[in-house]
């Protein structure tokens, strides 16, 4: 993997490196170490040229595609997904819907009740939903999504979360919806 450290130069100069090696050290003795100048003081060991080339190509692809086009595509997918998912009996989508649906990002957290559920029927457990969708070849995230206090406040143990991006299609959303319905019919 690869990451990017971006920050104000004055703060980066004051920050100590978190690991050592390679060209990040200017001089070293038993008594003292002098770190190299920016950006080298944060580059321990041999740079990962393959990963940096891959990152450069990925950024180039994003720029060629256009961030506005990507945002438009994700927005269309999200609206399509919300509309399709709302048609599912017993579906509860977390986040803005209705007239505020345009405020929803390309991440949809949801829970769903079994078919024929009453208002008091519990929702299908998010881990059951996620595991069974996985068996159908559909990837969703389940759990509290590093937001356990929010889940507690909402009164839920966890949710299923579907995310959409540049490479997703409406057909994949249709597959997700059919998968949710199939899992729902098992309970």
Feature annotation, model-predicted:
Residues 1-187:
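Pyridoxal 5′-phosphate
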